[in-house]
Amino acid sequence: MSKELSPLGQRMKEYEKAYDFIFPNNVPIIVRIDGKNFSTYTKNFNKPFDDIVTFAMVHTMKYLCANISNCRFGYTQSDEITLVLFEKTLFDKENDYKDIFIKTPYESFEKSVPFNNRAMKSNSLFASMATMVFNRYFKIAAHMVFCSEINGSEILPEEREMWDNNKDELRKWTCRDNYQTYVNKFDSAMFDSRMFVVPTFDIINNIIFRQEDAIKNSISAYARCYIKDTDGKNGLQLQEELKELGLPWDELPLFEQHGTCCYKENVVMFRNGKPFNREKWVIDKEMPIIKDNKEWFLEKIL
C-alpha cells in the first residue's frame, strides 16, 4: 500500500508539524520531570519526608538515566527529577576541564534525544516512562515496608536485587501503621515532562539552581512540621528556631537536605573468574553542594 498521504492527510500532518519543535544536534539538553499535584497525592503520607516516596523517586531517576539515550547525570529532590543530556562528542575527556566550556566539536553531529530530536514525542515518552516506573517502584517500596515477602511472579530479577538491598533500611525508617494509605495511591501518580536547551556553561548552573531550591524546600517542609507560624520567616530564621527546639535541620541525612543524584561509575566485575571494567549507574545519597564542588560535578558528567 502506498504511503503517500491524501490532501486531507497532508493537511492534518501540517497541523501536527506546527507544534513539533525539533532540537538542534550537539547541544546540552535539560529534561525536567515533575509529579502532578503531589501535595495532594502525598497528603496523608509521612511528614516531612516520606521514605516510600523518596525511594520511588530515586529509583525512577536511576531508571530514566539508564534508559534515556545520552543521559549523563540525574538529580532528584521533592517530586521532581532533572536529567542532563548531551552527546559524547560534546566534550573531549582528554582536554583539561578548564577548556571544557569553549570546545565546540564539528567533526560529527549526533541526535540528542529520541525520535530525531522531536521535543513533543520525547516529552510524552519521558513523562510516560516516569509515570510507569514510579508507580511500579512505589508499590514495591510499600511492600518492602509492610510485607515480609513479595510474590516472585510479581517482581523482576533486577527488582529482586532492589528488594534485598533496601527492605531492611526502609523498614527501619518508615512508620508501619498506615499500609492502606499507600495502597489507596497505587498506580495513581502522574508526571509531566519538559525539555530545554542550555548553553554548555549553564549545565552545572541548572543543577545548582535545582539544588538551591531543594534546600529551601527541605527547610520549609521540616519547619512546618514543628513550628506553628512559619510565615514571613527566612531559611536562617527557621533553622535557628528548629535548633532551639533540639531539631537542627543540618543534622538531617544529606539527601533530605539537598537531594540525590545518579551518575555512571566504572566498577570491576567478574566473568568466569576474570575481572573486567564496566560502567554502571550509581545512586549517590551523599552528594556534595554543587556550587562549592564544581570540579566534582564535572568529573561525574564526563
Residue ranges and their predicted role:
Residues M1-L302:
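Regulatory and interdomain segments flanking nucleotide-handling catalytic cores
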